[in-house]
Amino acid sequence: MIYVDADACPVKPEILKVAERHGLEVTFVANSGLRPSRDPMVRNVIVSAGFDAADDWIAERAKDGDIVVTADVPLAVRCVGAGALVTGPTGRVFDETNIGMASAMRDLSAHLRETGESKGYNAALTSRDRSAFLETLDRLCRRVKR
């Protein structure tokens, strides 16, 4: 199973492509509108607009043998702790060896934004990022199928 934190996820088409190739189910979870899919391997879940509702839904279900796609570091922390394989939309893998540092960097960035030291702009996703994501997701899919 691939769980996707789908609000503002820029790699949905890539996820569908890789999941289809590997025969894995995909669940897109969001607070609002998702495009319907006729594919029986794709499920859309709309959660309440509450704070972290999509994150909570995914974190309550993700387990060993699942893949989670998210750019949200706190969600990644929870899913890594549950044994899931986690990647961001740029192909960055979050695991037990780097999730602590990712969380610390997120907290530092939030502090810098609050103090006005940083504007907090996120770079646009590049074609190189998309390629790295495709490679990472393909590798994670092969790993869960073993």
Swiss-Prot record:
Pfam families: DUF188. It comes from the Bacteria. Transmembrane segments: none annotated. HAMAP family: UPF0178. Belongs to the UPF0178 family. This is UPF0178 protein R01393. It comes from Rhizobium meliloti (strain 1021) (Ensifer meliloti).
